[in-house]
Regions:
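Short, glycine-/aromatic-enriched active-site segment of Class I SAM-dependent methyltransferases
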Residues: 163-186, 191-192
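Low-complexity, intrinsically disordered Gly/Pro/Thr-rich segments
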Residues: 189-202
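Residue-level detector of anion-binding/catalytic polar loops
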Residues: 109, 159, 203
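Conserved N-terminal segment of class I S-adenosyl-L-methionine
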Residues: 1-130, 134, 147, 163, ...
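A short His-aromatic
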Residues: 135-139
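A short glycine-rich, Lys/Arg-flanked "PGG" loop and its adjoining helix->strand segment in the class I
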Residues: 147-156
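Short N-terminal helix/helix-N-cap motif within the alpha/beta-hydrolase-1
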Residues: 141-145
Length: 218
């Protein structure tokens, strides 16, 4: 664990000058003043065994209408922006890739990748018209590196759709259900994702709460 005042580069935007934000029980959180990300002290991130054990408790049935409705916050605006017959990647799809099923039913081809449940690294060597990242970015141990990777897999003009619960008031952070998930190690605001997009010269819009659509230049 880093001593108080020992700053580190932001893992989201790589800016210097992050500072300690809040200590809650045995977990210490840092804040970046540049992109407004909040992140868990890197020394306290869970290991892969702990992560997998937690993920196995997730019950995301691809046929569950309630789960599909939840995902529609991203799928609806993404589908409205895509031309017919695109090829995409569901990055961090988990054990029940419901979003991929929705997009496939809409006429698109969707590859799957998840480091635990669909670890097909060949999927990472291809380029796509769109990439979705739903309920995944909060698990990133190295967010800047991950967004660089995602951008590298997008074709010119390709779209990245991100869905993660945006942090709101700092006063609510300690009791926030999203923070209490032990595998959630980084928290974004809409402004955070706007910085991520701007650094890579992508366009940015947030068509719904907790959703961002970014487009790589054509």
């Amino acid at each position: 664990m880093r001593p108080p005042g020992d700053a580190m580069p932001c893992p989201v935007c790589r800016a210097a000058g992050t500072g300690r934000f809040l200590g809650i029980e045995d977990r210490n959180y840092w804040r970046c003043p540049t992109c407004e990300a909040t992140f868990l002290d890197p020394a306290q991130r869970p290991g892969p065994v702990e992560e997998l054990a937690h993920y196995r408790h997730h019950e995301n049935d691809p046929d569950d209408p309630h789960y599909r409705r939840f995902l529609s916050k991203l799928s609806d605006p993404l589908l409205a922006a895509l031309p017919p017959g695109c090829r995409g990647l569901d990055y961090g799809c988990g054990p029940g890739p419901a979003l991929a099923a929705v997009l496939t039913e809409a006429g698109h081809e969707v590859q799957l990748y998840d480091p635990f449940f669909h670890p097909d690294r060949q999927a990472l060597d291809q380029c796509y018209d769109f990439i979705t990242c739903t309920e995944t970015a909060e698990h990133f141990h190295h967010p800047a590196r991950e967004f660089d990777r995602l951008g590298g897999m997008l074709k010119p003009g390709g779209m990245l759709g991100v869905m993660t619960c945006f942090q709101t008031d700092d006063a609510r952070f300690a009791d926030w259900h999203y923070r209490k998930d032990p595998t959630h190690v980084v928290f974004y605001r809409a402004a955070t994702l706007a910085v991520i997009a701007r650094q890579r010269h992508w366009s940015f819009e947030s068509p719904a709460k907790d959703v961002a659509l970014m487009r790589k230049p054509g």
